[in-house]
Amino acid sequence: QTFKQKVPIAGKKVFIKPNIVEFNSNRPIHTNPVVVESMIRLCLEEGAAEIVVGEGSGHRRNMGCLLRECGLEKVLIENKIRFVDINYDQTKRVVNLGAKSKLGFIYFSKEAYESDVLISVPKLKTHHWTNVTLSLKNLFGIASGQAYGWPKNELHFQGIVNSIVDINSTRKADLSLVDGIVGMQGDGPLYGEPINANVLLMSDDPVAIDATCSRFMGFDPAGIEHIRLCSKVGLGNLA
């Protein structure tokens, strides 16, 4: 009941953003398709008018091949869900509400930005630049590939932390579900080792869920700059 009150889905267009950056059968790089399917079914049960899954990898150019390799294509076909390659989706220009970078506007995937309910479904992983990659970092992927190129270098040049804050300030996730069934530790987000974390976490507060996951992973979230700054600008609760 609390979930229904906080994130009403009935009659809404839902955009689900997993983390599908690369595939390696020996490493837990991508969001488990089972977790994505669980979110799809939850949204269907709640009466979503439309469900779209979208991703735009900054590492692999061929999303079709990547979807097949990681097993998500099968889930999408079986559930009759449309997929949007964010790297090629139409662009939506929006005033940058974060203003941490020097960018006056943020260019988003039109489908992601205009969705009624934006759901971030990341993997529980370490990251060599940001310490962790969770719900907040996952929304880096809804920035337009057509506007920023591949792999969205302009956002990197502005500073990853600044860009994460700006993106989330301008279009925050309405709901986050972190796949921590098998997480990644060490040299993430691509080359770390698997760890059986055995957790799934869901929240309508992207800062709180990232802070909780960070503590679970052994980090102090107050020492992770993008989480601390997102809390400071009012995007969620760090405590």
Where are the regions that the model predicts?
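N-terminal and secondary-structure boundary signal
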Residues: 1-239
